[in-house]
């Protein structure tokens, strides 16, 4: 049985009618696949030998089936390649997001550590200032106590000198009284001449004693006045020296504070400039990365793979350079901060 007779037996009459309608130019068929109709359209229904028709039709059907199989395999391979590409892109995006998250966490930790360090340094400076203030107050109290002690000793010495002076005066008065008593006894015992002589002698002695007493008193008063004058001069000189010393110390502290303030301002400015440069470098890197991604999307599949590898390598190099730059910046800031710290 030839292929056409088998085809007529197997296929309904309506399908055969539609097949010949397709060959004559009309469209549409609901019974056979499009590939089969494409193959049948190429078959000639002229009156030729049944064997020749059979062989050509089988060959054409085999070629059509082979082409369909190859097209299906190509479609399947293209879909698999597309899925692999999408998976690779998702993985790449996930890794980039993970790296950005890690960088943000590192930055956050570094900022927290920096704040803790600054708080510790502020606390340390406050404690040092408190200790200096307490030491200054102790020194001031010690000096005040010393001055009070010296004043008490001076007062004690003055009182002792006064008592000694009063005792000397009492002694002199007692001696004078004794002499007067002796003179009176001598006056009574002796005659009028002797009485006159004793009176004159007593008068002379009294005048000499009074003169001596006045001279001693004047001398002591002069010495006391000179001593007081010298003490006041020494006290004024001491106070002037202390004032000068305090003024110089205050001037030095003020200069040191101004120098420290200038150094801190310079360091802050330097750190701000370094941070600005790092930020600009990061922005440039981000722009370069976006440009690289855009270029890789526009290129073909093979070219995209090569560009992707190049972009990956560039990104890795940029990340390494960024990390090295951040480490150098951290070291530089730490060294500058160490220089700004007050020496113990």
From Swiss-Prot:
UniProt keyword annotations, A-Z: Cytoplasm, Repeat
Disulfide bonds: none
Ranges for region Disordered: 206-244, 285-318
UniProt GO cellular component terms: cytoplasm
Main localization (coarse): cytoplasm
Any GO BP: sperm axoneme assembly
Sequence repeat copies, ranges: 74-89, 90-105, 106-121, 122-137, 138-153, 154-169, 170-185, 186-201, 202-217, 218-233, 234-249, 250-265, 266-281, 282-297, 298-313, 314-329, 330-344
Region (17 X 16 AA approximate tandem repeats of K-K-K-C-X-E-X-A-[KQ]-K-X-X-E-X-A-X): 74-344
Compartments reported by the entry: Cytoplasm
Expressing tissues: Testis. Located in spermatocytes and spermatid bundles.
Residue spans of biased composition, Basic and acidic residues class: 285-315
Record's keyword annotation contains Cytoplasm: yes
Free-text function comment from the UniProt entry: Possible structural role in the sperm tail. It is associated with axonemal structures.
UniProt remark on domains: The predominant structure is alpha-helical.
Protein name from the UniProt record: Axoneme-associated protein mst101(1)
């Amino acid at each position: 049985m030839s292929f056409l007779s088998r085809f007529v037996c197997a296929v309904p009459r309506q399908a055969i009618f539609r097949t010949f309608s397709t060959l004559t130019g009309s469209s549409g068929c609901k019974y056979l696949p499009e590939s089969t109709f494409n193959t049948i359209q190429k078959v000639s229904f002229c009156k030729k030998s049944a064997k020749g028709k059979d062989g050509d039709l089988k060959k054409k059907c085999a070629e059509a089936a082979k082409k369909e199989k190859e097209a299906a395999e190509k479609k399947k391979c293209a879909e698999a390649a597309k899925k692999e590409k999408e998976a690779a892109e998702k993985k790449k995006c996930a890794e980039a997001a993970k790296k950005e998250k890690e960088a943000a966490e590192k930055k956050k930790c570094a900022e927290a550590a920096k704040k803790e360090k600054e708080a510790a340094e502020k606390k340390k400076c406050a404690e040092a200032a408190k200790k200096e203030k307490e030491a200054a107050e102790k020194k001031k109290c010690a000096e005040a106590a010393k001055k009070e002690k010296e004043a008490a000793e001076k007062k004690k010495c003055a009182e002792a000198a006064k008592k000694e002076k009063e005792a000397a005066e009492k002694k002199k008065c007692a001696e004078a009284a004794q002499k007067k008593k002796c003179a009176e006894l001598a006056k009574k015992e002796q005659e009028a001449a002797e009485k006159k002589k004793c009176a004159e002698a007593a008068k002379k002695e009294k005048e000499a004693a009074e003169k001596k007493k006045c001279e001693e008193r004047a001398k002591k008063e002069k010495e006391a006045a000179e001593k007081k004058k010298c003490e006041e001069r020494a006290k004024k000189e001491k106070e002037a020296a202390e004032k000068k010393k305090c003024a110089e110390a205050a001037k030095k502290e003020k200069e040191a504070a101004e120098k420290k303030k200038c150094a801190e301002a310079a360091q802050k400015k330097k750190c701000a400039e370094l941070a600005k440069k790092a930020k600009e470098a990061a922005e440039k890197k981000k722009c370069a990365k976006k440009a690289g991604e855009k270029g890789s999307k526009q290129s073909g599949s093979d070219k995209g793979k090569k560009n992707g590898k190049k972009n990956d390598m560039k990104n890795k190099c940029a990340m390494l350079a960024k990390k090295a730059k951040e480490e150098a910046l951290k070291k530089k800031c730490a060294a500058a901060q160490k220089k700004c710290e007050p020496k113990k």
